[in-house]
Amino acid sequence: MNTEIPVQPRGATGGRLSNYLASAFAIGVSMISLSVAISSNRTQERLLAASVWPALEYGTGNRGADGSDVISMNVGNSGVGPARLRSFQVLYQGRPAPNAASLLTQCCGLADAPAYTVTSGVSGRVLKAGEELSFLLLPREKNDAAVWDRFNRERFNARVQACYCSVLDACWRLDSELAEPEPVASCPDVPDAQEWSG
């Protein structure tokens, strides 16, 4: 007995339509996957940047840890990542003061008598998270009392400007006259004669 099973011819549009729908679905899933991957990558970049974010701060005081009269000018990193200091300036009335003698002469009438100070250069240093650096210490003892008293008032008129970067080369500019550091594309070059050298 010879039995043939009749085969129904497939409609010309039915097979193609399902192929198109399957292809469109696959493309849609691929686009969603790509979008999720890009979004995840951006989130990872932001998390990495936040995990190495430095935050430079400037401060000044007039008491040493032992209670003695010592004027200090300090810069510290209160962020979570290291701060690479690219430039650092101290200005008084808009003029750079590259060292303690220059600053004390400009602000406080330091004459030919030497001032007894402890200073430190800042540019080119790396401050780890939580680290603080005193770049100028002026003890009252061994210094002219009139110069010390005047500097104790005028230290608030000294302006500190610095540019620093994270390990990912994101950079900020600190200006002691502004509330917080501002992001910059890169740190500008500052002439050596205008950099704080201590």
Language-model segment annotations:
Residues 1-9, 89-198:
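An amphipathic alpha-helical interaction surface
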Residues 2-111, 121, 192-198:
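Membrane-proximal alpha-helical anchors
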